[in-house]
A protein has these predicted regions:
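Mixed-charge (Asp/Glu-Lys/Arg
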Residues: 1-33, 39-144
Length: 144
C-alpha cells in the first residue's frame, strides 16, 4: 500500500508542477474528495483527478481511468472535470527527457467506456501498434 501511495503522491505533485508551469493556480482539497487538485486559470476552476501510471513488464504503462476495485465505475461531472494521467517516461526510458501528461475529460472517458489505458511513448509501441490510442490526449491542456 505504501508503494501505491507514493506513486499516487508523486503523480499528483508532478501534475501540479506541470500545471503551475502552464499558468494554473493549484489548490489541494482537504478531506475525501473525488478529485486530487483544483486548477484555476483565468477565473475558471477545474477539478482534476490524477492517475499515476505504472510500468508493465513489456515497457508499456497502465493507468486506471475508473474508481473502485470491486465495484468499478466511471467518474462523472459531479465528481471531477478531467483525469490527468501522469507517465514517468523520463525515469524509465533512456533518451526520453519529458514525462507524459494525458488530459482526458470525464465526458470523453464516459463516451469511450474504458476502465484503463495502456500508454507508451509515441513511436515506441510493439508490433503493428507504434502509437497508442491515447496519444491524442497527450498535453491536451486546452480541452480543460
Amino acid at each position: 500500500m505504501i508503494g501505491n501511495l507514493k506513486v499516487g503522491t508523486d503523480g499528483e505533485l508532478a501534475v501540479a508542477a506541470k500545471m503551475a508551469q502552464l499558468g494554473y493556480n493549484i489548490s489541494f482539497p482537504m478531506g475525501g474528495t473525488p478529485y486530487d487538485l483544483i486548477a484555476e486559470k483565468d477565473g475558471v476552476c477545474v477539478r482534476v483527478q490524477v492517475k499515476a501510471a505504472t510500468l508493465q513488464k513489456r515497457g508499456s504503462y497502465r493507468v486506471n481511468l475508473s474508481y473502485g476495485r470491486l465495484n468499478k465505475g466511471f467518474y462523472d461531472k459531479s465528481m471531477c472535470d478531467a483525469i490527468v494521467a501522469y507517465v514517468p517516461y523520463s525515469r524509465d526510458y533512456e533518451g526520453i527527457h519529458e514525462d507524459g501528461f494525458y488530459v482526458i475529460t470525464v465526458e470523453k472517458i464516459q463516451e469511450l467506456k474504458k476502465f484503463h489505458a495502456t500508454l507508451f511513448p509515441a513511436g515506441m509501441g510493439r508490433g503493428r501498434i507504434r502509437t497508442c490510442m491515447w496519444e491524442q490526449y497527450r498535453d491536451a491542456w486546452a480541452t480543460i
